[in-house]
Design a protein with these regions (language model features):
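Conserved catalytic network of the ASCE P-loop NTPase/AAA+ motor domain
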Residues: 9, 36-38, 44-49, 70-74, ...
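Conserved nucleotide-binding/hydrolysis micro-motifs of P-loop NTPases
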Residues: 61-62, 84-89, 104, 113-118, ...
Length: 633
Protein backbone atom coordinates (compact mmCIF):
# COMPACT_ATOMS: atom_id res chain seq x y z
CA UNK A 1 0.00 0.00 0.00
CA UNK A 2 1.10 3.55 -0.74
CA UNK A 3 -0.08 6.34 1.55
CA UNK A 4 0.39 10.03 0.79
CA UNK A 5 -0.06 12.94 3.12
CA UNK A 6 -2.08 15.97 2.05
CA UNK A 7 -3.09 19.26 3.59
CA UNK A 8 -2.21 22.91 4.11
CA UNK A 9 1.32 24.07 4.84
CA UNK A 10 2.43 23.84 8.50
CA UNK A 11 -0.42 21.55 9.55
CA UNK A 12 2.03 18.86 10.68
CA UNK A 13 2.16 16.35 7.81
CA UNK A 14 5.89 15.62 8.05
CA UNK A 15 5.77 15.33 11.83
CA UNK A 16 2.93 12.82 11.63
CA UNK A 17 4.80 10.70 9.08
CA UNK A 18 7.78 10.70 11.45
CA UNK A 19 5.57 9.74 14.39
CA UNK A 20 4.20 6.79 12.42
CA UNK A 21 7.44 5.59 10.78
CA UNK A 22 10.34 7.07 12.74
CA UNK A 23 11.63 8.68 9.53
CA UNK A 24 12.12 12.43 9.05
CA UNK A 25 11.25 12.85 5.38
CA UNK A 26 12.55 16.43 5.19
CA UNK A 27 15.99 15.55 3.84
CA UNK A 28 17.08 18.83 2.25
CA UNK A 29 19.09 21.33 4.35
CA UNK A 30 16.75 24.10 3.17
CA UNK A 31 13.75 22.11 4.39
CA UNK A 32 15.29 21.65 7.82
CA UNK A 33 16.35 25.29 8.02
CA UNK A 34 12.93 26.67 7.04
CA UNK A 35 10.79 23.95 8.61
CA UNK A 36 9.03 23.68 5.26
CA UNK A 37 8.61 20.65 3.01
CA UNK A 38 9.77 21.52 -0.51
CA UNK A 39 10.38 18.15 -2.16
CA UNK A 40 8.65 14.79 -1.93
CA UNK A 41 9.71 12.78 1.09
CA UNK A 42 9.60 9.00 1.39
CA UNK A 43 9.39 6.53 4.26
CA UNK A 44 8.66 2.80 4.52
CA UNK A 45 7.24 1.12 7.59
CA UNK A 46 5.48 -2.03 8.76
CA UNK A 47 2.15 -0.91 10.20
CA UNK A 48 1.77 -4.24 11.96
CA UNK A 49 0.88 -6.86 9.37
CA UNK A 50 4.42 -7.81 8.36
CA UNK A 51 4.45 -5.91 5.04
CA UNK A 52 6.16 -2.66 4.14
CA UNK A 53 3.89 0.32 3.56
CA UNK A 54 5.15 3.26 1.54
CA UNK A 55 4.59 6.81 2.78
CA UNK A 56 4.90 9.85 0.51
CA UNK A 57 5.09 13.19 2.30
CA UNK A 58 4.05 16.05 0.03
CA UNK A 59 4.58 19.81 0.42
CA UNK A 60 1.60 21.90 1.50
CA UNK A 61 2.65 25.34 0.30
CA UNK A 62 0.74 26.71 -2.71
CA UNK A 63 4.03 27.24 -4.61
CA UNK A 64 4.68 23.49 -4.56
CA UNK A 65 1.31 22.16 -5.75
CA UNK A 66 2.95 20.64 -8.85
CA UNK A 67 5.15 18.57 -6.51
CA UNK A 68 2.14 17.62 -4.42
CA UNK A 69 0.27 16.35 -7.51
CA UNK A 70 3.30 14.27 -8.51
CA UNK A 71 3.30 12.70 -5.06
CA UNK A 72 -0.36 11.76 -4.80
CA UNK A 73 -0.73 10.33 -8.32
CA UNK A 74 -1.13 6.57 -8.18
CA UNK A 75 -1.55 6.28 -4.40
CA UNK A 76 -3.94 3.96 -2.55
CA UNK A 77 -4.77 5.97 0.57
CA UNK A 78 -4.51 9.60 1.65
CA UNK A 79 -3.70 10.76 5.16
CA UNK A 80 -5.38 14.16 5.08
CA UNK A 81 -3.89 16.38 7.76
CA UNK A 82 -5.87 19.37 9.06
CA UNK A 83 -4.70 21.39 12.05
CA UNK A 84 -7.30 21.81 14.79
CA UNK A 85 -6.25 25.39 15.55
CA UNK A 86 -6.38 26.64 11.92
CA UNK A 87 -9.11 24.40 10.59
CA UNK A 88 -9.51 24.01 6.82
CA UNK A 89 -7.33 26.47 4.89
CA UNK A 90 -6.90 27.34 1.17
CA UNK A 91 -4.57 24.45 0.37
CA UNK A 92 -6.83 22.11 2.36
CA UNK A 93 -9.57 22.79 -0.17
CA UNK A 94 -7.22 22.67 -3.17
CA UNK A 95 -5.60 19.40 -2.04
CA UNK A 96 -9.07 17.91 -1.51
CA UNK A 97 -10.12 18.97 -5.02
CA UNK A 98 -6.97 17.42 -6.50
CA UNK A 99 -7.56 14.15 -4.66
CA UNK A 100 -11.13 14.09 -5.95
CA UNK A 101 -9.97 14.73 -9.53
CA UNK A 102 -7.40 11.92 -9.23
CA UNK A 103 -10.01 9.47 -7.99
CA UNK A 104 -8.59 8.93 -4.48
CA UNK A 105 -11.50 7.50 -2.49
CA UNK A 106 -9.83 5.90 0.56
CA UNK A 107 -8.29 7.81 3.39
CA UNK A 108 -8.35 9.16 6.90
CA UNK A 109 -8.38 12.70 8.26
CA UNK A 110 -5.73 13.32 10.91
CA UNK A 111 -7.00 16.27 12.96
CA UNK A 112 -3.61 17.48 14.17
CA UNK A 113 -2.36 19.79 16.94
CA UNK A 114 -5.28 18.94 19.24
CA UNK A 115 -3.09 19.81 22.23
CA UNK A 116 -3.52 23.48 21.24
CA UNK A 117 -7.33 23.68 21.26
CA UNK A 118 -10.33 23.18 23.50
CA UNK A 119 -12.88 20.39 23.23
CA UNK A 120 -15.38 22.88 21.84
CA UNK A 121 -12.98 23.96 19.10
CA UNK A 122 -12.25 20.32 18.30
CA UNK A 123 -15.96 19.61 17.84
CA UNK A 124 -16.41 22.75 15.73
CA UNK A 125 -13.53 21.92 13.37
CA UNK A 126 -14.64 18.28 13.08
CA UNK A 127 -18.09 19.42 11.97
CA UNK A 128 -16.57 21.84 9.44
CA UNK A 129 -14.39 19.06 8.03
CA UNK A 130 -17.34 16.69 7.72
CA UNK A 131 -19.22 19.35 5.75
CA UNK A 132 -16.15 19.90 3.54
CA UNK A 133 -15.88 16.16 2.79
CA UNK A 134 -19.61 15.60 2.22
CA UNK A 135 -19.66 16.11 -1.59
CA UNK A 136 -16.45 14.09 -2.16
CA UNK A 137 -15.46 10.43 -2.38
CA UNK A 138 -13.80 10.80 1.05
CA UNK A 139 -17.11 11.62 2.76
CA UNK A 140 -17.11 8.44 4.87
CA UNK A 141 -13.51 8.51 6.08
CA UNK A 142 -12.71 8.67 9.78
CA UNK A 143 -11.62 11.89 11.49
CA UNK A 144 -9.04 11.06 14.16
CA UNK A 145 -7.72 13.65 16.64
CA UNK A 146 -3.92 13.45 17.01
CA UNK A 147 -0.92 15.28 18.39
CA UNK A 148 2.42 14.23 16.95
CA UNK A 149 4.35 16.16 19.61
CA UNK A 150 2.59 14.46 22.52
CA UNK A 151 1.94 11.13 20.81
CA UNK A 152 -1.80 11.42 21.27
CA UNK A 153 -3.87 9.34 18.84
CA UNK A 154 -0.88 7.98 16.91
CA UNK A 155 -1.71 4.35 17.62
CA UNK A 156 -5.34 4.90 16.66
CA UNK A 157 -4.17 6.51 13.41
CA UNK A 158 -1.83 3.58 12.78
CA UNK A 159 -4.69 1.16 13.41
CA UNK A 160 -6.97 3.00 10.99
CA UNK A 161 -4.31 2.93 8.26
CA UNK A 162 -3.76 -0.78 8.88
CA UNK A 163 -7.51 -1.40 8.63
CA UNK A 164 -7.58 0.46 5.32
CA UNK A 165 -4.66 -1.66 4.13
CA UNK A 166 -6.46 -4.88 5.02
CA UNK A 167 -9.61 -3.89 3.15
CA UNK A 168 -7.76 -2.54 0.12
CA UNK A 169 -8.56 -4.61 -2.98
CA UNK A 170 -5.44 -6.03 -4.63
CA UNK A 171 -4.05 -4.02 -7.53
CA UNK A 172 -4.79 -5.63 -10.87
CA UNK A 173 -1.63 -7.15 -12.34
CA UNK A 174 -2.83 -6.96 -15.94
CA UNK A 175 -1.53 -4.50 -18.50
CA UNK A 176 1.98 -3.43 -19.40
CA UNK A 177 4.51 -2.12 -16.91
CA UNK A 178 4.35 1.65 -16.30
CA UNK A 179 6.27 3.63 -13.71
CA UNK A 180 5.81 7.40 -13.31
CA UNK A 181 9.26 8.83 -12.60
CA UNK A 182 9.34 11.28 -9.69
CA UNK A 183 13.09 11.15 -8.99
CA UNK A 184 16.17 10.51 -11.13
CA UNK A 185 19.75 10.57 -9.89
CA UNK A 186 23.20 9.06 -10.28
CA UNK A 187 24.35 6.69 -7.56
CA UNK A 188 28.08 6.15 -7.19
CA UNK A 189 29.01 2.62 -8.20
CA UNK A 190 25.57 1.90 -9.66
CA UNK A 191 24.78 4.56 -12.24
CA UNK A 192 21.36 5.91 -13.12
CA UNK A 193 18.54 5.28 -10.65
CA UNK A 194 14.94 6.30 -11.19
CA UNK A 195 12.14 6.02 -8.64
CA UNK A 196 8.39 6.24 -8.86
CA UNK A 197 5.05 4.58 -8.35
CA UNK A 198 4.20 1.55 -10.49
CA UNK A 199 0.86 2.27 -12.16
CA UNK A 200 0.38 -1.11 -13.87
CA UNK A 201 1.98 -4.38 -14.90
CA UNK A 202 5.08 -6.17 -13.66
CA UNK A 203 8.83 -5.86 -14.23
CA UNK A 204 11.82 -8.01 -13.32
CA UNK A 205 15.56 -7.54 -13.05
CA UNK A 206 17.10 -8.08 -16.48
CA UNK A 207 13.97 -6.97 -18.32
CA UNK A 208 13.96 -4.28 -20.97
CA UNK A 209 12.16 -1.04 -20.21
CA UNK A 210 11.55 2.03 -22.36
CA UNK A 211 12.11 5.63 -21.33
CA UNK A 212 9.33 7.85 -22.73
CA UNK A 213 8.70 10.34 -24.14
CA UNK A 214 12.27 11.11 -25.22
CA UNK A 215 14.50 8.12 -24.63
CA UNK A 216 14.92 4.58 -25.87
CA UNK A 217 15.36 1.04 -24.61
CA UNK A 218 17.11 0.47 -21.28
CA UNK A 219 17.90 -2.61 -19.21
CA UNK A 220 17.02 -3.10 -15.53
CA UNK A 221 20.22 -3.95 -13.65
CA UNK A 222 18.64 -3.98 -10.22
CA UNK A 223 15.67 -2.74 -8.24
CA UNK A 224 14.35 -1.91 -4.81
CA UNK A 225 10.68 -2.20 -3.84
CA UNK A 226 9.56 -0.27 -0.76
CA UNK A 227 13.23 0.34 0.05
CA UNK A 228 14.12 -3.38 -0.02
CA UNK A 229 16.19 -5.13 -2.70
CA UNK A 230 13.88 -7.10 -4.99
CA UNK A 231 13.79 -9.07 -8.23
CA UNK A 232 10.28 -8.05 -9.33
CA UNK A 233 8.00 -5.03 -9.03
CA UNK A 234 4.27 -4.79 -9.68
CA UNK A 235 1.40 -2.33 -9.72
CA UNK A 236 0.82 -0.39 -6.51
CA UNK A 237 4.42 -0.46 -5.30
CA UNK A 238 7.06 2.21 -4.81
CA UNK A 239 10.02 1.15 -6.90
CA UNK A 240 13.61 2.24 -7.59
CA UNK A 241 15.16 0.99 -10.82
CA UNK A 242 18.87 0.91 -11.58
CA UNK A 243 18.90 1.18 -15.39
CA UNK A 244 21.59 1.10 -18.05
CA UNK A 245 21.75 1.42 -21.81
CA UNK A 246 23.08 3.33 -24.76
CA UNK A 247 19.99 5.57 -24.69
CA UNK A 248 21.27 7.20 -21.48
CA UNK A 249 24.09 8.82 -23.42
CA UNK A 250 21.77 11.08 -25.37
CA UNK A 251 19.01 12.14 -22.97
CA UNK A 252 18.42 12.87 -19.31
CA UNK A 253 15.62 11.27 -17.31
CA UNK A 254 13.46 13.79 -15.48
CA UNK A 255 10.51 13.87 -13.13
CA UNK A 256 7.42 13.46 -15.26
CA UNK A 257 8.99 10.90 -17.61
CA UNK A 258 7.87 7.28 -17.64
CA UNK A 259 9.50 3.86 -17.62
CA UNK A 260 7.24 1.51 -19.56
CA UNK A 261 7.14 -1.84 -21.33
CA UNK A 262 7.78 -1.67 -25.08
CA UNK A 263 4.10 -2.36 -25.86
CA UNK A 264 3.11 0.78 -23.95
CA UNK A 265 5.84 3.06 -25.31
CA UNK A 266 4.08 6.03 -26.87
CA UNK A 267 3.73 9.77 -26.46
CA UNK A 268 1.63 12.44 -28.14
CA UNK A 269 1.10 16.19 -28.19
CA UNK A 270 -2.65 15.83 -28.56
CA UNK A 271 -4.82 13.93 -26.11
CA UNK A 272 -8.60 13.56 -26.11
CA UNK A 273 -10.04 13.84 -22.62
CA UNK A 274 -13.20 14.19 -20.62
CA UNK A 275 -12.72 17.24 -18.38
CA UNK A 276 -14.64 18.75 -15.52
CA UNK A 277 -14.27 22.35 -14.39
CA UNK A 278 -14.43 22.77 -10.62
CA UNK A 279 -17.81 24.01 -9.44
CA UNK A 280 -16.28 26.88 -7.47
CA UNK A 281 -14.44 28.35 -10.47
CA UNK A 282 -15.41 32.04 -10.70
CA UNK A 283 -16.05 31.93 -14.45
CA UNK A 284 -16.27 29.60 -17.43
CA UNK A 285 -13.09 28.32 -19.10
CA UNK A 286 -12.91 29.69 -22.64
CA UNK A 287 -12.12 27.45 -25.58
CA UNK A 288 -8.34 27.21 -26.13
CA UNK A 289 -7.60 28.29 -22.54
CA UNK A 290 -3.87 27.92 -21.68
CA UNK A 291 -3.42 25.37 -18.89
CA UNK A 292 -0.88 23.33 -16.96
CA UNK A 293 -1.60 19.61 -17.37
CA UNK A 294 -0.56 17.25 -14.57
CA UNK A 295 -0.54 13.51 -15.37
CA UNK A 296 1.50 11.09 -13.29
CA UNK A 297 4.47 13.17 -12.15
CA UNK A 298 4.48 15.36 -15.28
CA UNK A 299 3.63 19.04 -15.59
CA UNK A 300 3.17 20.09 -19.22
CA UNK A 301 1.73 23.32 -20.61
CA UNK A 302 -0.81 23.41 -23.40
CA UNK A 303 -4.27 24.53 -24.43
CA UNK A 304 -7.68 23.09 -23.66
CA UNK A 305 -9.73 22.86 -26.87
CA UNK A 306 -13.38 21.86 -26.57
CA UNK A 307 -14.89 19.65 -29.26
CA UNK A 308 -17.80 22.04 -29.81
CA UNK A 309 -15.70 25.20 -29.53
CA UNK A 310 -17.74 26.46 -26.58
CA UNK A 311 -16.61 27.63 -23.13
CA UNK A 312 -16.89 25.20 -20.19
CA UNK A 313 -19.07 26.39 -17.33
CA UNK A 314 -18.14 25.79 -13.67
CA UNK A 315 -19.17 22.26 -12.71
CA UNK A 316 -19.65 21.21 -16.35
CA UNK A 317 -18.18 17.99 -17.77
CA UNK A 318 -17.32 17.95 -21.51
CA UNK A 319 -15.18 16.23 -24.15
CA UNK A 320 -12.10 18.21 -25.15
CA UNK A 321 -8.64 17.89 -26.61
CA UNK A 322 -5.43 18.92 -24.88
CA UNK A 323 -2.96 20.43 -27.35
CA UNK A 324 0.35 20.14 -25.50
CA UNK A 325 3.59 22.05 -25.94
CA UNK A 326 5.62 18.84 -25.74
CA UNK A 327 4.85 15.11 -26.09
CA UNK A 328 3.39 13.37 -23.07
CA UNK A 329 2.91 9.66 -22.36
CA UNK A 330 -0.64 8.78 -21.39
CA UNK A 331 -3.02 5.85 -21.75
CA UNK A 332 -6.78 5.61 -21.63
CA UNK A 333 -8.08 6.02 -18.09
CA UNK A 334 -5.16 8.10 -16.80
CA UNK A 335 -6.41 10.85 -14.54
CA UNK A 336 -5.24 14.43 -14.87
CA UNK A 337 -5.34 17.76 -13.07
CA UNK A 338 -5.61 21.13 -14.82
CA UNK A 339 -4.19 24.33 -13.35
CA UNK A 340 -4.36 27.83 -14.75
CA UNK A 341 -1.72 29.42 -16.98
CA UNK A 342 0.19 30.89 -14.03
CA UNK A 343 0.05 27.56 -12.14
CA UNK A 344 -1.51 29.35 -9.17
CA UNK A 345 -4.93 27.71 -9.13
CA UNK A 346 -6.44 24.29 -9.82
CA UNK A 347 -9.29 24.81 -12.29
CA UNK A 348 -10.37 21.26 -13.08
CA UNK A 349 -9.31 17.84 -14.19
CA UNK A 350 -10.49 14.73 -15.89
CA UNK A 351 -9.58 11.46 -17.50
CA UNK A 352 -7.83 10.48 -20.74
CA UNK A 353 -10.21 8.97 -23.31
CA UNK A 354 -7.98 8.69 -26.39
CA UNK A 355 -4.22 9.06 -25.85
CA UNK A 356 -3.40 8.96 -29.58
CA UNK A 357 -6.13 10.74 -31.52
CA UNK A 358 -5.73 10.61 -35.29
CA UNK A 359 -8.38 12.79 -36.85
CA UNK A 360 -7.28 12.43 -40.47
CA UNK A 361 -10.29 11.50 -42.53
CA UNK A 362 -12.66 11.35 -39.56
CA UNK A 363 -15.86 13.34 -39.48
CA UNK A 364 -16.93 15.09 -36.30
CA UNK A 365 -19.69 12.50 -35.79
CA UNK A 366 -17.19 9.63 -36.20
CA UNK A 367 -14.87 11.24 -33.70
CA UNK A 368 -17.60 11.64 -31.09
CA UNK A 369 -18.80 8.09 -31.67
CA UNK A 370 -15.27 6.75 -31.26
CA UNK A 371 -14.74 8.71 -28.04
CA UNK A 372 -18.02 7.33 -26.72
CA UNK A 373 -16.71 3.84 -27.46
CA UNK A 374 -13.39 4.56 -25.74
CA UNK A 375 -15.26 5.83 -22.67
CA UNK A 376 -16.85 2.42 -22.12
CA UNK A 377 -15.50 0.53 -19.09
CA UNK A 378 -13.80 -2.42 -20.79
CA UNK A 379 -11.77 -2.96 -23.97
CA UNK A 380 -13.84 -5.98 -24.99
CA UNK A 381 -17.02 -3.94 -24.62
CA UNK A 382 -15.44 -0.96 -26.36
CA UNK A 383 -14.09 -2.75 -29.45
CA UNK A 384 -17.36 -3.67 -31.24
CA UNK A 385 -18.64 -0.12 -30.73
CA UNK A 386 -15.33 1.38 -31.87
CA UNK A 387 -15.42 -0.70 -35.06
CA UNK A 388 -18.88 0.64 -35.87
CA UNK A 389 -17.81 4.19 -35.00
CA UNK A 390 -14.95 4.06 -37.52
CA UNK A 391 -16.29 2.33 -40.64
CA UNK A 392 -13.11 3.24 -42.50
CA UNK A 393 -11.06 0.95 -40.27
CA UNK A 394 -9.59 0.81 -36.78
CA UNK A 395 -5.87 0.49 -36.01
CA UNK A 396 -6.00 -2.38 -33.52
CA UNK A 397 -2.40 -1.93 -32.39
CA UNK A 398 -3.13 1.65 -31.37
CA UNK A 399 -6.42 0.57 -29.77
CA UNK A 400 -4.73 -2.15 -27.71
CA UNK A 401 -1.92 0.17 -26.63
CA UNK A 402 -4.42 2.86 -25.64
CA UNK A 403 -6.12 0.33 -23.35
CA UNK A 404 -2.72 -0.87 -22.07
CA UNK A 405 -3.31 -4.47 -23.10
CA UNK A 406 -0.40 -6.90 -22.84
CA UNK A 407 0.31 -9.69 -25.33
CA UNK A 408 -2.19 -12.22 -23.98
CA UNK A 409 -4.86 -9.56 -23.57
CA UNK A 410 -4.31 -8.38 -27.15
CA UNK A 411 -4.62 -11.93 -28.47
CA UNK A 412 -7.91 -12.35 -26.62
CA UNK A 413 -9.17 -9.05 -28.03
CA UNK A 414 -8.62 -10.23 -31.61
CA UNK A 415 -11.08 -13.09 -31.05
CA UNK A 416 -13.99 -10.63 -31.06
CA UNK A 417 -16.61 -12.37 -33.28
CA UNK A 418 -17.69 -9.18 -35.10
CA UNK A 419 -14.07 -8.33 -36.04
CA UNK A 420 -12.56 -8.84 -39.48
CA UNK A 421 -8.76 -8.47 -39.56
CA UNK A 422 -7.39 -6.56 -42.52
CA UNK A 423 -3.65 -5.99 -42.58
CA UNK A 424 -0.38 -5.66 -40.74
CA UNK A 425 -0.01 -3.42 -38.83
CA UNK A 426 -3.26 -4.96 -37.74
CA UNK A 427 -6.33 -3.07 -38.90
CA UNK A 428 -9.91 -4.11 -38.34
CA UNK A 429 -13.47 -3.52 -39.49
CA UNK A 430 -16.70 -5.33 -38.76
CA UNK A 431 -17.57 -8.49 -40.68
CA UNK A 432 -20.67 -6.71 -41.99
CA UNK A 433 -18.61 -3.73 -43.18
CA UNK A 434 -16.21 -6.07 -45.01
CA UNK A 435 -19.12 -7.55 -46.95
CA UNK A 436 -20.44 -4.08 -47.78
CA UNK A 437 -17.03 -3.04 -49.14
CA UNK A 438 -16.69 -6.20 -51.26
CA UNK A 439 -20.11 -5.59 -52.78
CA UNK A 440 -19.31 -1.91 -53.34
CA UNK A 441 -16.05 -2.70 -55.17
CA UNK A 442 -17.74 -5.21 -57.45
CA UNK A 443 -20.58 -2.79 -58.14
CA UNK A 444 -18.15 0.05 -58.93
CA UNK A 445 -16.26 -2.11 -61.44
CA UNK A 446 -19.49 -3.31 -63.02
CA UNK A 447 -20.70 0.29 -63.39
CA UNK A 448 -17.37 1.34 -64.92
CA UNK A 449 -17.50 -1.48 -67.44
CA UNK A 450 -21.05 -0.54 -68.44
CA UNK A 451 -20.20 3.15 -68.80
CA UNK A 452 -16.91 2.64 -70.63
CA UNK A 453 -16.80 -0.74 -72.39
CA UNK A 454 -13.75 0.41 -74.37
CA UNK A 455 -11.71 0.63 -71.15
CA UNK A 456 -10.11 -2.39 -69.53
CA UNK A 457 -11.16 -1.30 -66.05
CA UNK A 458 -10.25 1.06 -63.20
CA UNK A 459 -6.97 1.88 -61.53
CA UNK A 460 -6.76 1.48 -57.76
CA UNK A 461 -7.10 5.20 -57.14
CA UNK A 462 -10.14 5.34 -59.41
CA UNK A 463 -11.76 2.41 -57.63
CA UNK A 464 -11.00 3.91 -54.22
CA UNK A 465 -12.58 7.20 -55.33
CA UNK A 466 -15.61 5.41 -56.76
CA UNK A 467 -16.36 3.85 -53.35
CA UNK A 468 -16.95 7.31 -51.86
CA UNK A 469 -15.83 6.02 -48.48
CA UNK A 470 -13.05 7.14 -46.17
CA UNK A 471 -10.97 3.99 -45.77
CA UNK A 472 -7.62 3.32 -44.19
CA UNK A 473 -5.38 2.26 -47.06
CA UNK A 474 -4.73 -1.12 -45.46
CA UNK A 475 -8.46 -1.83 -45.29
CA UNK A 476 -8.92 -1.02 -48.99
CA UNK A 477 -5.94 -3.20 -49.91
CA UNK A 478 -7.12 -6.12 -47.78
CA UNK A 479 -10.63 -6.20 -49.24
CA UNK A 480 -9.31 -5.81 -52.79
CA UNK A 481 -6.62 -8.48 -52.32
CA UNK A 482 -9.27 -10.88 -51.03
CA UNK A 483 -11.40 -10.30 -54.13
CA UNK A 484 -8.38 -10.81 -56.40
CA UNK A 485 -7.33 -13.99 -54.55
CA UNK A 486 -10.86 -15.37 -54.89
CA UNK A 487 -10.86 -14.66 -58.63
CA UNK A 488 -13.77 -12.23 -58.34
CA UNK A 489 -11.57 -9.34 -59.54
CA UNK A 490 -8.70 -9.56 -62.04
CA UNK A 491 -5.62 -7.40 -61.76
CA UNK A 492 -4.31 -6.57 -65.27
CA UNK A 493 -1.11 -4.64 -64.67
CA UNK A 494 -2.25 -1.41 -63.04
CA UNK A 495 -5.90 -1.96 -63.95
CA UNK A 496 -8.66 -3.82 -62.10
CA UNK A 497 -11.57 -5.50 -63.89
CA UNK A 498 -14.21 -8.15 -63.47
CA UNK A 499 -13.26 -11.60 -64.87
CA UNK A 500 -15.88 -11.54 -67.62
CA UNK A 501 -14.88 -8.11 -68.96
CA UNK A 502 -12.41 -7.28 -71.73
CA UNK A 503 -11.76 -3.91 -73.32
CA UNK A 504 -13.43 -3.29 -76.68
CA UNK A 505 -10.79 -1.48 -78.66
CA UNK A 506 -11.49 -0.32 -82.20
CA UNK A 507 -9.71 -2.12 -85.06
CA UNK A 508 -7.71 1.07 -85.68
CA UNK A 509 -6.52 1.19 -82.05
CA UNK A 510 -5.63 -2.51 -82.15
CA UNK A 511 -3.54 -1.95 -85.26
CA UNK A 512 -1.82 1.08 -83.78
CA UNK A 513 -1.09 -0.73 -80.50
CA UNK A 514 0.72 -3.45 -82.46
CA UNK A 515 3.05 -0.72 -83.78
CA UNK A 516 3.51 1.17 -80.48
CA UNK A 517 3.97 -1.74 -78.08
CA UNK A 518 7.22 -3.11 -79.62
CA UNK A 519 8.87 0.32 -79.33
CA UNK A 520 7.95 0.54 -75.64
CA UNK A 521 9.11 -3.05 -75.07
CA UNK A 522 12.45 -2.55 -76.85
CA UNK A 523 13.96 -1.06 -73.70
CA UNK A 524 11.02 -0.84 -71.34
CA UNK A 525 12.89 1.17 -68.67
CA UNK A 526 13.82 3.85 -71.22
CA UNK A 527 10.50 4.73 -72.79
CA UNK A 528 10.78 7.53 -75.36
CA UNK A 529 8.85 10.77 -74.96
CA UNK A 530 5.67 11.08 -77.02
CA UNK A 531 7.27 13.41 -79.56
CA UNK A 532 10.11 10.97 -80.31
CA UNK A 533 7.68 8.06 -80.40
CA UNK A 534 5.51 9.90 -82.94
CA UNK A 535 8.55 10.63 -85.10
CA UNK A 536 9.68 6.99 -85.00
CA UNK A 537 6.22 5.85 -86.12
CA UNK A 538 5.74 8.71 -88.57
CA UNK A 539 2.51 9.65 -86.79
CA UNK A 540 0.85 12.94 -85.94
CA UNK A 541 1.90 13.89 -82.38
CA UNK A 542 -1.61 14.94 -81.31
CA UNK A 543 -3.23 11.77 -82.65
CA UNK A 544 -0.65 9.57 -80.91
CA UNK A 545 -1.12 11.41 -77.63
CA UNK A 546 -4.89 10.89 -77.78
CA UNK A 547 -4.31 7.19 -78.49
CA UNK A 548 -1.93 6.81 -75.52
CA UNK A 549 -4.45 8.44 -73.22
CA UNK A 550 -7.06 5.90 -74.37
CA UNK A 551 -4.83 2.87 -73.87
CA UNK A 552 -3.67 4.24 -70.49
CA UNK A 553 -7.30 4.10 -69.36
CA UNK A 554 -7.34 0.50 -70.56
CA UNK A 555 -4.28 -0.31 -68.43
CA UNK A 556 -1.94 -1.03 -71.33
CA UNK A 557 0.40 1.84 -70.39
CA UNK A 558 0.98 4.10 -67.37
CA UNK A 559 1.05 7.85 -67.90
CA UNK A 560 3.81 9.27 -65.66
CA UNK A 561 3.83 12.74 -67.26
CA UNK A 562 2.27 14.63 -70.14
CA UNK A 563 5.03 13.46 -72.44
CA UNK A 564 6.05 9.99 -71.21
CA UNK A 565 4.29 6.61 -70.91
CA UNK A 566 5.65 3.29 -69.60
CA UNK A 567 4.44 -0.27 -69.79
CA UNK A 568 3.06 -1.59 -66.45
CA UNK A 569 5.95 -4.10 -65.97
CA UNK A 570 8.41 -1.20 -66.15
CA UNK A 571 6.54 0.70 -63.43
CA UNK A 572 6.52 -2.43 -61.29
CA UNK A 573 10.31 -2.62 -61.59
CA UNK A 574 10.65 1.08 -60.71
CA UNK A 575 8.45 0.55 -57.66
CA UNK A 576 10.55 -2.43 -56.55
CA UNK A 577 13.63 -0.23 -56.87
CA UNK A 578 12.03 2.43 -54.64
CA UNK A 579 11.23 -0.20 -52.02
CA UNK A 580 14.81 -1.52 -52.16
CA UNK A 581 16.15 2.01 -51.63
CA UNK A 582 13.87 2.56 -48.61
CA UNK A 583 14.48 -0.67 -46.69
CA UNK A 584 14.50 -0.06 -42.90
CA UNK A 585 13.13 3.44 -43.36
CA UNK A 586 16.03 4.75 -45.46
CA UNK A 587 15.53 7.77 -47.71
CA UNK A 588 16.93 8.32 -51.19
CA UNK A 589 17.73 11.07 -53.68
CA UNK A 590 16.88 11.34 -57.37
CA UNK A 591 20.55 10.59 -58.09
CA UNK A 592 20.33 7.36 -56.05
CA UNK A 593 17.34 6.26 -58.11
CA UNK A 594 18.99 7.28 -61.40
CA UNK A 595 22.14 5.29 -60.64
CA UNK A 596 20.16 2.15 -59.82
CA UNK A 597 17.60 2.48 -62.63
CA UNK A 598 20.02 3.48 -65.37
CA UNK A 599 17.65 6.01 -66.94
CA UNK A 600 18.10 9.67 -67.82
CA UNK A 601 17.63 12.54 -65.38
CA UNK A 602 14.44 13.90 -66.99
CA UNK A 603 12.78 10.48 -66.91
CA UNK A 604 13.87 10.01 -63.28
CA UNK A 605 12.24 13.28 -62.22
CA UNK A 606 9.01 12.40 -64.05
CA UNK A 607 8.87 8.89 -62.54
CA UNK A 608 9.53 10.11 -59.00
CA UNK A 609 7.03 12.95 -59.26
CA UNK A 610 4.47 10.38 -60.43
CA UNK A 611 5.21 8.24 -57.36
CA UNK A 612 4.77 11.36 -55.19
CA UNK A 613 1.39 12.06 -56.80
CA UNK A 614 -0.01 8.58 -56.26
CA UNK A 615 1.16 8.53 -52.65
CA UNK A 616 3.89 5.91 -52.92
CA UNK A 617 6.63 8.36 -51.89
CA UNK A 618 6.95 11.71 -50.14
CA UNK A 619 9.54 14.32 -51.02
CA UNK A 620 11.19 16.56 -48.42
CA UNK A 621 13.95 18.69 -49.91
CA UNK A 622 16.25 16.45 -51.91
CA UNK A 623 15.17 13.28 -50.10
CA UNK A 624 12.26 10.94 -50.63
CA UNK A 625 10.74 8.41 -48.24
CA UNK A 626 8.38 5.50 -48.82
CA UNK A 627 5.00 6.83 -47.77
CA UNK A 628 2.58 3.99 -48.47
CA UNK A 629 4.03 0.53 -47.91
CA UNK A 630 1.06 -1.15 -49.57
CA UNK A 631 0.29 1.08 -52.56
CA UNK A 632 1.02 -0.32 -55.98
CA UNK A 633 2.26 1.85 -58.85
Amino acid sequence: MIIASAGHVDHGKTLLVKALTGVDTDALPEEKARGLTIELGFAYHDLGDGSATGFIDVPGHERFIRTMVAGVSGIDVVMFVIAADDGPMPQTAEHLAILELLGVSRGVVALSKIDRVSEARLAEVSATIRTLLAPTALRACSILPVSALQGIGIEALRGELLALQRTLPPRASHGNFRLAVDRSFLLKGAGRVVTGTVFSGQLGVGDAVWHVPEGGELRVRGMHVHNQEATHASAGQRCALNVSGVALRDVEIHRGDWMVAAAAASAARRIDVEVRVLADEPSALANRTPVHVHIGAADVTGRLVTLDGQAIAPGERVLAQLMLDRPLHTLRGDRLVLRDQSARRTVGGGVVIDPAPDMRGRTRDERRAYLAAMALPDAHVSLPTALIALPGGLDLEVFARSWNLNGDERAALLKEPTLKLCASPVLGITVARWQILEDAMLAALSAAHAAHPERLGLGERELEKALRARLLRGVFDAVLDALVSAGRVVRDGAVLRLPQHSARRSPADDALWKRVCPLLERDELKAPVVHDLASALNLNHTLLEAFLIRVAKQGLVVKVSAKRYFLPPAMTRFEQLVRALTVDGNKFTAADFRDRAGVGRNAVIEILEYFDRIGLTHRSGDLRALLDTKRRA
